[in-house]
């Protein structure tokens, strides 16, 4: 059986840490080793039908990358390398985003929504969604109809809640991702 691909962008290493925690919860038999998008080519991501993608928040809620002030290549540069005719139809994706609700309350985890919208525009099925309860912020582009588009982690302010949030979220998305891997693929 194909594995769930885990890919992330990071500037400080925190998104990588969370990606590794997710893989540990899923197990190596189910989930591939997390890979940084600044070290791979699009074909490596596109080879997976079930994906978990992680992003930090950066700038004023843009997709992280050089134009948002990142020193290293991130999602912005990776997405620019995707084929012009890319289609993510048939791919099921769960997302997680990092943010700092006290420091950036007016745009908390907004980069997650930007990545979500790009992937959905390419035809991906996004699974997950996450409640806003337990977070304190003024505004977030990542909130749609009263819920985050997917998991949000605030390692800076609420690091003590990360493990419990990951446990609950993995339990929610794992069966949906595995179901995608067990479906027969079109030729």
Question: At which residue positions do the language-model features occur?
Answer:
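Residues at the starts of beta-strands that form the adenosine-phosphate
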Residues: 2-4, 31, 92, 125
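A short beta-strand-loop structural module common to alpha/beta enzyme folds
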Residues: 29-41, 130
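Short helix-loop-beta junction
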Residues: 19-30, 117-121
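N-terminal beta1-alpha1 ligand-phosphate binding loop
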Residues: 2-25
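FMN-binding flavodoxin-like domain, especially the glycine-rich phosphate-binding loop
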Residues: 17, 48-187
């Amino acid at each position: 059986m194909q594995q769930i691909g885990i890919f992330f962008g990071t500037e400080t290493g925190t998104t990588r840490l969370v990606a590794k925690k997710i893989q540990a919860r899923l197990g190596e038999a189910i989930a591939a080793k997390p890979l940084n998008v600044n070290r791979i080519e699009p074909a490596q991501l596109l080879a997976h039908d079930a994906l978990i993608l992680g992003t930090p928040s950066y700038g004023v809620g843009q997709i992280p990358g050089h134009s948002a002030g990142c020193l290293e290549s991130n999602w912005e540069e990776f997405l620019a390398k995707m084929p012009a005719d890319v289609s993510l139809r048939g791919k099921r994706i769960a997302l997680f985003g990092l943010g700092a609700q006290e420091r950036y309350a007016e745009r908390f985890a907004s980069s997650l929504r930007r990545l979500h919208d790009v992937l959905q525009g390419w035809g991906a099925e996004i699974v997950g969604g996450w409640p806003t309860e337990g977070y304190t912020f003024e505004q977030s582009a990542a909130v749609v109809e009263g819920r985050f588009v997917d998991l949000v982690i605030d390692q800076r302010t609420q690091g003590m809640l990360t493990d419990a949030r990951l446990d609950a979220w993995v339990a929610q998305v794992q069966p949906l991702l595995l179901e995608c891997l067990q479906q027969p693929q079109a030729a």
